[in-house]
A protein has these predicted regions:
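Membrane-proximal periplasmic segments of bacterial cell-envelope enzymes
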Residues: 1-272, 276-297, 333-334, 339-342
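Solvent-exposed coil/turn segments that connect beta secondary-structure elements
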Residues: 36, 58, 66, 73, ...
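Beta-lactam-recognizing serine transpeptidase/beta-lactamase-like catalytic domain environment
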Residues: 69, 75, 283-296, 308, ...
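Short alpha-helix boundary/capping segments
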Residues: 85, 89, 308, 580, ...
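Solvent-exposed, polar/charged alpha-helical surfaces in well-ordered, non-transmembrane soluble domains
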Residues: 91-99, 201, 205, 209, ...
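Amphipathic, well-packed alpha-helical segments that form the structural scaffold of globular domains
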Residues: 245, 273-276, 284-287, 317-325, ...
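Conserved, well-ordered alpha-helix/loop/beta-strand core segments that scaffold catalytic motifs
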Residues: 289-341
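Flexible helix-coil linker/hinge segments at domain or subdomain boundaries
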Residues: 672-682
Length: 688
């Protein structure tokens, strides 16, 4: 039998329910009656807008995960036109903003290419500024030849700038109104106007404390360079121009997106660029943000790891700089002629570039800090911006002779035991007036009888003239192509393909016939052959590993932004092979070994007592017209277990032997075990 509910409990429950109803009614009365008007006004004056949330760009790392380029966030000031032009005096607000920026020590962006004080004249313009001005003049229906004064007169009238303002203040207001207005002119494709980039907290605080309307604070990311090395490889970023926008807009990029402009930043844009998000931002009447709701989270870009080793890159740049500047400092007849140069080191087993150095170089951290900095670098006589390692084209000189040797051996023109007598002069075509000499003839002696190994050691022109005379030029060119000379290397950065001297090349360049002398000169690396330092390093690696040419891709891997997920791992790609017998490789490799280790070798002075056995070939590329020769040098090491191949080029360096020390200094670093302070633990026991 159920127990009856006591009357007291029913009374208590009824009281509680009554109390809850009373509280609810009072709260509802306060919300709708007492505070209803205030809530209505707050809601009526609140503005919700959809805004883009910038995604961070991915970082660039070296092969061991050391950060080369990352991001740093910064606060920018941008105008809110809807808010600004609802104010009673937008021009006065703009002037107030500009003055506040200056008083806080910041700098604002004024895109009007007119001097800031009378007499008003046009300033020097970038191509973007010219396009912007042309579009504005067309919009304003002003003549393309309108003067700066006429332009400002139009701006004063169009933007209703009060005549009470001084000429300088009028110019300030006109510049800001011009910068805002051009964003709304059709087909100009300008990025969003950022009034102040990387605004200081003092400025932001001052503007907010004084309730200055018409602007917003946005967050963006700028690239931070953690090294001054590898400038030609890393590249830089920037806002899109109109031409780039036509390409990237199909991929969903907004006009204000930052994209890679050069180097790895451009080559790996698809990995580095993130996907922007969106958010609903609510503001009250004072412009204060009262709420942010993400409708799409931004997706940051991925980490890109290069094949470059930062320590080896440092060693390459230091060795190259030291070597060239030492050559310049010597009081010799040709020291003043010494120019730029390059050093490239690649992994023999994979073809991966480990270091790509140029001289002169530049510092990405300071290049774009000011127009003066960029102008000084871009207009320098020695062309620091020129990527000699990838774009420079140089005659290989005698460094080409191993290629001629392999071609001759493989085609049966010679064997490893064939001896050719050097008499100092190649006399076969003497009756036609053509009798080229060996380099040693100037000393009044000869090389005597040389086999192919000895001929490489001695760099005997007569031997290689004889081989080249028996090889059709197209056959020699086929071997050069298999070695990658005159071919794309597979690197993702802009490169020159160079050219192998052939009948077709001469016809194209000079529209003249091919003669036997052209074949002889091509066989010793002269004539019309031009190759890049990167090609020469990969060629040397192919000799070292016995005929396998790999891609020179500088992409090692791609990982997610936080490094937790592997997205892509680049594997060594074989581009071509040079098929010949092992005994032929051994003969050529031994010849290069003797260049560095036999007293008769041209690099013996540099490597004869070196702690690691090196195989090398020197080259002297004649330029004619009384110019000082270019110096070319290739080597690989260790000789009996090749790991690294190096190519060095110095413009007007006189002779290949004179730059062997640059490669030696680099190898010193290569064969030095890294210390705990500079290397991940997994590297400590490696001799690379």
């Amino acid at each position: 039998m159920e127990k009856p509910i006591k009357p007291g409990r029913i009374t208590a429950l009824a009281c509680m329910l009554t109390l809850l109803v009373i509280v609810f009614v009072v709260a509802l009365y306060k919300l709708q009656i007492v505070d209803g008007k205030a809530y209505y006004e707050e809601n009526r004056n609140s503005v919700a807008s959809s805004q883009t949330v910038a995604a961070a760009r991915g970082s660039i790392l070296d092969r061991y995960g050391r950060v080369l380029v990352s991001n740093t966030s910064c606060n920018n000031l941008v105008f809110n036109p809807d808010d600004l032009f609802e104010q009673d005096d937008p021009n006065g607000i703009l002037l107030r903003l500009a003055r506040t920026v200056v008083s806080c020590g910041d700098t604002y962006v004024d895109e009007l290419p007119v001097t800031t004080a009378p007499p008003f004249e046009y300033t020097d313009m970038t191509e973007t500024q010219r396009t912007q001005l042309k579009g504005f003049l067309k919009y304003a229906k002003l003549d393309e030849e309108a003067t700066a004064v006429e332009l400002l007169s139009y701006c004063r009238e169009k933007f209703e700038i009060n005549n009470n303002y001084s000429a300088a203040d009028m110019r300030t207001i006109a510049g800001l109104r011009y910068s805002i207005k051009t964003r709304y002119i059709d087909k100009l494709y300008l990025p969003d106007y950022v009034f102040v980039k990387d605004a200081s907290m003092d400025l932001i605080t001052s503007l907010k404390e004084n309730n200055v309307p018409g602007f917003e604070v946005t967050v963006s990311y700028t690239r931070q360079y953690h090294t001054n090395l590898a400038a030609h490889l890393l590249g830089y970023t920037g806002l899109m121009n109109a031409e780039e926008y036509t390409t990237y807009k199909t991929q969903g990029y907004p006009m204000s997106a930052t994209v890679g402009k050069d180097g790895a930043e451009l080559a790996f844009e698809k990995y580095l660029h993130g996907t922007d998000g969106t958010a609903i931002v609510t503001k009250n009447a004072a412009g204060t943000v009262t709420g942010t709701t993400y409708t799409k989270e931004p997706e940051p870009g991925n980490q890109v790891s290069l094949t470059i080793d930062l320590d080896l890159q440092s060693a390459a740049e230091q060795s190259l700089t030291k070597g060239i500047e030492n050559m310049k400092s010597k009081s010799t007849e040709n020291s003043d002629a010494v120019g730029g140069g390059a050093l490239v080191a690649v992994d023999v087993a994979t073809g991966q570039p480990l270091a790509i150095a140029n001289y002169p170089t530049f510092d990405l951290q300071t290049l774009f800090q000011s127009e003066e900095n960029y102008k000084a670098v871009s207009e320098a006589d020695n062309q620091p911006l020129f990527n000699r390692a990838l774009l420079g084209q140089y005659s290989p000189g005698s460094t080409f002779k191993p290629c001629t040797a392999i071609a001759g051996l493989t085609e049966g023109v010679i064997t490893t035991g064939t001896e050719i007598q050097c008499t100092g002069t190649f006399r076969k075509y003497e009756d036609t007036g053509y009798a080229p000499k060996c380099w040693i003839a100037s000393s009044g002696t000869t090389h005597g009888n040389d086999n192919v190994t000895e001929a490489i050691r001695d760099s005997c022109n007569i031997f290689f003239y004889t081989v080249g005379d028996s090889l059709p030029i197209d056959t020699l060119a086929r071997y050069a192509a298999a070695f990658g000379l005159g071919e794309h290397t597979g690197i993702e950065l802009p490169e020159s393909t160079g050219q192998m001297a052939t009948e077709a090349v001469k016809k194209k360049l000079e529209n003249t016939n091919w003669y036997v002398g052209d074949s002889l000169q091509a066989a010793i690396g002269q004539s019309y052959s031009l190759f890049t330092p990167l090609q020469l390093s990969e060629y040397c690696a192919t000799i070292a590993n016995g005929g396998t040419r790999h891609s020179a891709s500088i992409l090692k891997s791609v990982r997610s932004y936080d490094g937790s997920e592997l997205i892509y791992e680049n594997e060594a790609e074989v581009l071509s092979t040079v098929e010949t017998g092992d005994y032929n490789w051994a003969a050529v490799q031994k010849g290069m070994y003797l260049v560095a280790n036999d007293p008769a070798g041209s690099a013996y002075e540099t490597f004869g007592s070196y702690g690691v056995k090196v195989a090398a070939k020197t080259g002297t590329a004649q330029l004619g017209d009384n110019q000082v020769n270019n110096a070319i040098f290739i080597c690989y090491a260790p000789y009996d277990n090749p790991k690294v191949a190096v190519a060095v080029v110095v413009e007007h360096g006189s002779a290949g032997a004179s730059i062997a020390s640059i490669a030696r200094d680099f190898l010193d670093a290569y064969f030095t075990v890294k210390t705990v302070s500079t290397a991940p633990e997994s590297e400590l026991s490696l001799l690379r």
